[in-house]
């Protein structure tokens, strides 16, 4: 039994940030019920190739990407645009502890599945909304993919080879780093909300935006700028503060030399 085995989570998320959060909760023991669209399911079910093979080694239509972030979950299909689907979600909410969703701002309000509506059914519900730009502000209504937010949030301005070198220019991370960090932040927020509920009996609405998380991820670069007034730039595989901390080509490939302090450097030389 995991630490969260006494909890039930409704997962109304798709793609990566939300599913990463709910998969973590499932790994910790929570019962996670994933609600998907009939006939389509989560977008990433179709993000292939590669596709998984069945027990006999035959290919399926299930993308490996989907399987990477949806283990340990139960999955049901509901059309939440219908009255019947909405009623079934409300029934599930009555017995749930946490709901996680990543619909565009205001979309669940149209279906009567927003926080205020569901709070009337389950007053101590913890309702976590994951969006590109948060619930308020000039960009709130915009959809936001990881790639877009990496650019807007400054990550691509410090990722990639230096501009003056061949191959220089903005690069996204090799994995969807903003989505993954956002999923982790959402998990932390939910765990904090559960602790708060245990002490007070109160539920709450958690507003998690990819852009907020991406800007927070820039902490050391932002502090360097605040201290010096010099905008951060791309350093390739080098470090903006310490040397040596980079990749070197050698006779049989590549090596990383990383010294985090003068003592390590003295031992190196």
Where does each model-flagged region fall?
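Acidic, glycine-rich segments within the central catalytic cores of soluble metabolic enzymes
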Residues: 152-269
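N-terminal helix-loop segment corresponding to the beta1-alpha1 unit
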Residues: 1-189, 193-202, 234
């Amino acid at each position: 039994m995991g630490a969260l085995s006494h909890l039930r989570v409704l997962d109304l998320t798709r793609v990566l940030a939300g599913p990463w959060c709910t998969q973590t909760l499932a790994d910790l023991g929570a019962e996670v019920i994933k609600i998907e669209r009939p006939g389509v399911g989560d977008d990433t079910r179709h993000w292939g190739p590669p596709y998984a093979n069945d027990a006999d080694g035959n290919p399926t239509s299930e993308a490996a990407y989907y399987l990477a972030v949806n283990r340990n979950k139960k999955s049901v299909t509901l059309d939440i645009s219908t009255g019947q689907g909405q009623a079934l979600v409300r029934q599930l909410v009555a017995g749930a502890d946490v709901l996680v969703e990543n619909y565009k701002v205001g979309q669940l309000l149209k279906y009567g599945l927003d926080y205020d509506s569901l709070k009337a059914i389950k007053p101590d519900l913890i309702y976590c909304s994951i969006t590109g730009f948060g619930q308020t502000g000039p960009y709130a209504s915009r959809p936001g993919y990881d790639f877009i937010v990496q650019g807007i949030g400054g990550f691509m301005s410090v990722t990639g080879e230096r501009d003056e070198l061949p191959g220089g220019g903005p690069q996204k991370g090799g994995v969807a780093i903003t989505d993954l960090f956002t999923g982790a932040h959402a998990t932390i927020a939910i765990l904090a909300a559960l602790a708060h509920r245990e002490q007070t009996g109160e539920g709450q609405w958690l507003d998690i935006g990819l852009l907020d998380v991406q800007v927070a991820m820039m902490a050391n670069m932002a502090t360097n700028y605040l201290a010096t007034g010099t905008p951060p730039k791309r350093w390739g595989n080098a470090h903006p503060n310490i040397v040596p901390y980079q990749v070197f080509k050698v006779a049989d490939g590549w090596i990383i030399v990383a010294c985090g302090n003068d003592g390590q450097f003295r031992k190196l030389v």
